[in-house]
Amino acid sequence: MQEYLEKRYALALYEIAEKNNKVDEYLRDLTDICDIFDENKEFYEVINHPKINTAKKKQLFTDLFKGKIDEELLSFMMILIEKDRILQLREILDQMEKIDLERRNTIRGIVKTVVPLLDEELEQLKAIFEKKYEKNILFDTKIDKSLLGGVYVKVGNDIIDGTIKSKVEEMKELMLKKE
């Protein structure tokens, strides 16, 4: 039930953002606000405190964000406060990002390497997966020294693990089976 509501809120906000041609702005602002929740324990406690009434919470948000975020986004936040759903903002943002990717015919992938890939190498990987999925691919690249070498790629349900670490583990398993 909770996820259903989060999707509905996300879709409603996405449609407003899309109508106003501010999808990227809303996503960026929501991310920043969620980061404030995550990084500022006192702020989170005030928002979560049952004895602080809705009017005070709304005033706090107005004081903090009026003039810094779009008025319609601020109004949306007021609705979340009224409905006691402001603490689900991260989940609503996650759903909104999924909607955005879907509307842009895009999926996310992860590329892990020991050293950064050259732009050309990343573009080659991207082209391979875009052809396979017939979607745009957005890769999150991560440096992971524990891989020892090679590359790890995950897109959708596909995983390509060409890392030295995985090869060593495979050899270790083979050697242990033979004993």
Curated annotation (Swiss-Prot):
GO molecular-function terms, A-Z: proton-transporting ATP synthase activity, rotational mechanism
Pfam families cross-referenced by the UniProt entry: OSCP
Keyword Phosphoprotein in annotation: no
Subcellular location per the Swiss-Prot or TrEMBL entry: Cell membrane
PROSITE patterns, sorted: ATPASE_DELTA (PS00389)
Signal peptide: none
Family annotation (HAMAP family): ATP_synth_delta_bact (MF_01416)
Cited InterPro entries: ATP_synth_OSCP/delta_N_sf, ATPase_OSCP/d_CS, ATPase_OSCP/dsu
Entry keyword set: ATP synthesis, Cell membrane, CF(1), Hydrogen ion transport, Ion transport, Membrane, Transport
Organism (species): Clostridium beijerinckii (strain ATCC 51743 / NCIMB 8052) (Clostridium acetobutylicum)
Role noted for this protein: F(1)F(0) ATP synthase produces ATP from ADP in the presence of a proton or sodium gradient. F-type ATPases consist of two structural domains, F(1) containing the extramembraneous catalytic core and F(0) containing the membrane proton channel, linked together by a central stalk and a peripheral stalk. During catalysis, ATP synthesis in the catalytic domain of F(1) is coupled via a rotary mechanism of the central stalk subunits to proton translocation.
PANTHER family: ATP SYNTHASE DELTA CHAIN
A cellular component term, taken from the record's GO annotations: proton-transporting ATP synthase complex
Entry's family note: Belongs to the ATPase delta chain family.
Identification of the protein by name: ATP synthase subunit delta
Membrane topology label: Peripheral membrane protein
Subunit structure, as described in the record: F-type ATPases have 2 components, F(1) - the catalytic core - and F(0) - the membrane proton channel. F(1) has five subunits: alpha(3), beta(3), gamma(1), delta(1), epsilon(1). F(0) has three main subunits: a(1), b(2) and c(10-14). The alpha and beta chains form an alternating ring which encloses part of the gamma chain. F(1) is attached to F(0) by a central stalk formed by the gamma and epsilon chains, while a peripheral stalk is formed by the delta and b chains.
